[in-house]
Amino acid sequence: MQGRSSAWLVKHELVHRSLGFDYQGVETLQIKPEDWYSIAVISYVYGYNYLRSQCAYDVAPGGLLASVYHLTRIQYGVDQPEEVCIKVFVPRSNPRIPSVFWIWKSADFQERESYDMLGISYDNHPRMKRILMPESWIGWPLRKDYIAPNFYELQDAY
């Protein structure tokens, strides 16, 4: 079954893949990394003016990484806003996705956290650096193939 967003993208000949609907009825779409920025701009113009959340996850050990965007159309007088979930899959060998910071400013910390935890680099992000881990940290802690260091630094609480 095709949702409104997928039908709109098909009508305008924009490449995507429908992944169905989640348990709340939110349509989920898969977009290629090279198409993501243009589809993000088009989505904003179409009315998806609010980036509810951005997250990322490791699909499988040694497999793909995914960056997930939850977009919402906020309109005056609408009780149930239209939502869409967009997933962008990238290979772990070169995980690069265009940043949407310049479209939705709320992507700032969220993309940085995805970089910090999974190593997905967001091209054209103004401050693409670690946000939670120290800059000297080696590796990406939320990857399924991450090997945790066997040391723990204890700090004096006083």
Swiss-Prot record:
Disulfide bonds: none annotated. It is found in: Plastid, Chloroplast thylakoid membrane. Signal peptide: none annotated. InterPro entries: NADH_DH_suC (IPR010218), NADH_quin_OxRdtase_su_C/D-like (IPR037232), NADH_UbQ_OxRdtase_30kDa_su (IPR001268), NADH_UbQ_OxRdtase_CS (IPR020396). PROSITE patterns: COMPLEX1_30K. It catalyses: a plastoquinone + NADH + (n+1) H(+)(in) = a plastoquinol + NAD(+) + n H(+)(out); a plastoquinone + NADPH + (n+1) H(+)(in) = a plastoquinol + NADP(+) + n H(+)(out). Keywords: Chloroplast, Membrane, NAD, NADP, Plastid, Plastoquinone, Quinone, Thylakoid, Translocase, Transport. It is a peripheral membrane protein. The keyword Chloroplast applies. Belongs to the complex I 30 kDa subunit family. NDH is composed of at least 16 different subunits, 5 of which are encoded in the nucleus. PANTHER family: NADH DEHYDROGENASE [UBIQUINONE] IRON-SULFUR PROTEIN 3, MITOCHONDRIAL, NADH DEHYDROGENASE UBIQUINONE IRON-SULFUR PROTEIN 3. NDH shuttles electrons from NAD(P)H:plastoquinone, via FMN and iron-sulfur (Fe-S) centers, to quinones in the photosynthetic chain and possibly in a chloroplast respiratory chain. The immediate electron acceptor for the enzyme in this species is believed to be plastoquinone. Couples the redox reaction to proton translocation, and thus conserves the redox energy in a proton gradient. This is NAD(P)H-quinone oxidoreductase subunit J, chloroplastic. The gene is ndhJ.
